[in-house]
Amino acid sequence: MKKIVGLLAAIMVLSLTACGGGSEESKATKEHVYRMEEVSIEEVEDKNTISDYFLREDTLYIIGYNWMEESRETYIVKKKLDGSESSMVTLTLTNNQYMGSLTVDDEGNYYCVLNEYFEDNSDPENYVWEENYYLLKMDGEGNELWKQSLKGEGEDSYYGVNWMKILGDGRIAIADAYGLTLYDTQGNVLKKVKQEEDSYMGDLIQLTDGTILNMSYSSENNKYMLQKMDIETGEKSEEYYVPGISSMYSYFPGISHDLLLVSNVGVYGYNLGDEEVTELMNFIDSDLNASYVYSIVPVSETEFYGMINDNLTGNTVLMKFTKVDPKDVVDKKILTLGCNGIGWDIRNQVVQFNKTNEKYRIQIRDYSQYNTDEDYTVGLTRLNTDIASGYVPDILVMDTSLPVESYISKGLFEDLYGYIDKDEELNKEDYFQNILRAYESNGKLYQLVPSFSIFTVAGKTSDVGAEPGWTLEELNEVMAGKPEGTLIFARETRASMLQYSIQMSSGQFINWETGECKYNSDAFIQLLEFLKQFPEQYDDGDYNDEFWRSYDSLWRDDKVLLSISYLDGFPSYNYMKKGTFGVDITLKGFPAEDRNGSTIIPNLDLVMAAKSKHKEGAWEFMRYFLMDEYQNSISYGWPLSLARVETMAEEAMRTEPYEDSFGNMVGYAQSYFVGDVEIKIDPITKEEVDDVMNFIMSVDRPHTYDENLINIISEEAAPYFSGQKNAKEVADIIQSRVQIYVNENR
């Protein structure tokens, strides 16, 4: 990537968008746009060594750490904002020294907590560990001015520093396990505030008006709590709770607001006592190739500095952010992408699409923003409600918890085959045909799954046979021939097995296309009987030290028959066969009447709204995930592209170091440990690759997680598990309730 030089360089010219006609959506995309300017730090070659920075008046202080073989160093780059001056101070430390909480005062002096330790383990019976802490002050050149020892209350008591801050009046505050200590600029102790037994000295935030806040986690409310604190007495008052999920934010002092809050969506303003946060900057609307901004320092109501980790380069970058006047944001047609949480691959492609597409712009509507500390499902519920009401975003990132069959039966999604067939750069034959078929409905493709994993059950071939698929009767026959005490699965409860059974074999009991349900069938009654043998919960006493010492050999030693397995690449199969089991295995699947108990878990699942007004634009975005550029970038999970999987197979079979498809030198090394014994695992063979490919191509059932369905079955099956009703009685009740549920949601 081209390096950009200058104090404030790399100005990103934003081609940002709005819908025509002045809609609320287009207005929103314009209101929260900032441009980014990279702060050039020529003195630092490896920007990823930067850890923090401070702004004092017109000067930036950038702090970083380098680790050498025999020593380590801390560097401080001092840079005027106008570029007129720039210099660097390097502080060399020994390997047993560490500088923490490094900061700078208004005069340019540096303060830190210096940790020095000594270790001698040459004599195991006389292990020596000594550790000392100091409050250290240095001048602008890094010369020591004074050093104050920091200790606990007792001679042998453990000591550690929670944080060190310079207060607005110049005093230094240090919080430790014993409370708060205030020092003057010469290192003299001014006051000690003892921490009460029922109180916790959390982090300290100084607002621009001088107010000091203490932030700590409230176990009573399961939220982060802000309290005003009297620094002289340590007394706290006036509790405040940020709306939403408080843990998703980082907290910084603001100018136009008491606090600036940063999430992976953007930057928000918050005034103490407000019931809502105010969005200031949206990362996607601003074309920011990063998921977070760290260490925000505001300069004005419309400017702030912050550090990012660039998603494209992986580099740490110090940026200046400046609000863009909405009238200067370029108009484009708006596409809405809905999701319940967003992955980095989608996020990056949205940013790239928005930068390069001259006609369309994507706005993300992430429903996870509605979740709260009290209820993490609010967003998913709201998304489902919107979809059921007919409001479907132009592009939707599906979640396995959503009732996709219900949506398809209502005609909410667009058939994608027509777009693929007309696309001159795409050929359906280049992809796993069974995966495409799995997401068809009546010959139409409504879901695009460009990457996936396989959820299955594995067992020794000598136990379960060589062919995939089996029934509960066949599993019971195998178990009947095993010694008493043999487990079917390791550490699985009745509830977890119920979930697995619904996720991996529910297709045999519901047909969403016809609405037919079979929960009063003999097959389902047998499933209930199978589930009853699993414990409601395990006693921790069942898992003593001996159990955990032998855990890695449970399958090898035939103490456990089966392993629930996520097959996400050739290495995972190789590890499972040659490590977990140590012999030939069969990917058997969960027992099911139709012998089809393995499922496809989409790593990404995209759909297009049937009523979208911008289908051409939606497809322009979606097609990228079928292109070689994306398919060849997949390293976790299975790509849809057969050619990419062939390359992955070739790499997995290599025994010598090689350069992978990402340009990295890779040396094969895979091991399995049984206790302290290391077992070297040979690379996968061509025959094993063929076995894996044949299995993958045989799987044609999508993985689902229908919480409503699981809840119905769990509630109604409980009387059977407790002995109050027989299996047939509860099966009839479940059949009735599920049939109503299906009828209402088709």
Language-model segment annotations:
Residues 20-70, 75-79, 83, 116-120, ...:
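Conserved N-terminal structural module of periplasmic/extracytoplasmic solute-binding proteins
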Residues 116, 160-162, 384-385, 393-394, ...:
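A structural signal for short loop-to-beta-strand junctions that line the ligand-binding cleft
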Residues 361-431, 440, 552-562, 578-579:
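Extracytoplasmic "Venus flytrap"/periplasmic binding protein-like
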Residues 407-411, 417, 432-473, 491-515, ...:
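Periplasmic solute-binding protein
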Residues 417-430, 507-528, 579, 589-599, ...:
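Short, solvent-exposed loop/beta-turn-alpha elements that line the ligand-binding surface or hinge
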Residues 514-548, 575, 585-590:
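Glycine-centered hinge/linker elements that transmit conformational signals in sensory
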Residues 577-654, 697-698:
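Extracytoplasmic/periplasmic substrate-recognition and gating elements
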Residues 600, 662-738:
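C-terminal capping/gating helix-and-loop segments adjacent to ligand/active sites or protein-protein/ligand interfaces
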